Regions:
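Active-site beta-strand/loop signature of hydrolases that rely on acidic residues for catalysis
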Residues: 1, 17-36, 99, 128-149, ...
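Conserved beta strand-loop-helix elements of the APE1-like EEP
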Residues: 58-74, 192, 201-224
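N-terminal, active-site-proximal structural segment of metallo-dependent hydrolase catalytic domains
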Residues: 1-43, 49, 55-61, 76, ...
Length: 249
């Protein structure tokens, strides 16, 4: 989650982008319309195919995938009108897998979007299961939930906070119960203080008072193909840090 891609590009993201040389970059919260793509972005992405799904509301939400190999097919959204005006999902289809990049809606303060979030989660889970009927799925992005107490610094004081409510955590449990794998916890089940998001308040990042709310989740059928899952907490430029999945398919 870049929290605005144009601002992030000036804060070290380009150096990270160049150094890691990934096959895919999945970006959330681009805050950008496709007609705003300029020469700066295109020069950075010259070796990549670009796929953007922007929100109807300018400067809000949005997702993008940059990939070296062209997909067989690209799908924007879930195909459900009420869920598809905020640019939150892009799916790329390849011979051996689907890649789904997602920016899950935040339940917000006072949990004003929690009811909507619950409906969203159910529809996404059904969508992923439908895809999985034909080939394995890699599902990634800012999923806006810390699943277990180990996934945030202060669980006791956040039980009613957006991102750690019982309802949101239960939806993640339901997804994993369908056979999907949280790749980071699959490899590092006991690793503490492994976070991907920090508030801008109270020097949270410097003190590592964070949450793990960004994920790579894969179909159980390809869990043995996972080589590593990494959190790049040293990369600045957003309130989130990049995460990485190394997998051979």
């Amino acid at each position: 989650n870049v929290n605005g891609i144009r601002a992030c590009l000036t804060k070290g993201f380009k150096d990270f982008f160049d150094s890691i040389d990934a096959d895919f970059f999945c970006i959330q919260e681009t805050k950008m319309q496709e007609d705003q793509i300029d020469l700066t972005i295109n020069s950075i992405l010259e070796d990549y195919n670009q796929y953007w799904n922007s929100a109807e509301k300018k400067g809000y939400s949005g997702t993008a995938i940059f990939c070296k190999e062209k997909p067989l097919n690209v799908t924007y959204g879930l195909g459900i009108e009420e869920h598809d005006n905020e640019g939150r999902i892009i799916t790329l289809e390849y011979d051996k897998f689907y890649l789904v990049n997602c920016y899950t809606p935040n339940s917000k303060r006072e949990l004003e979007r929690l009811d909507y979030r619950q409906v969203w989660e159910d529809e996404v889970r059904k969508y992923l299961k439908r895809l999985e009927e034909s080939k394995p799925v890699i599902y990634c992005g800012d999923l806006n939930v810390a699943h277990k107490e180990i996934d945030l610094k202060n669980p006791k004081t956040n039980h009613f906070s957006a991102g750690f409510t019982d309802e949101e955590r239960e939806k993640m449990t339901e997804l994993l119960n369908e056979g999907f794998i949280d790749t980071y916890r699959y490899l590092y089940p006991e690793k503490e203080e492994a976070y991907t998001w920090w508030s801008y308040m109270r020097q949270a990042r410097e003190k590592n008072i964070g949450w793990r709310i960004d994920y790579f989740i894969v179909s159980g059928s390809i869990k043995d193909k996972i080589e590593d899952a990494k959190i790049h907490s040293d990369i600045l430029g957003s309130d989130h840090c990049p995460i990485e999945l190394d997998i051979t398919l």
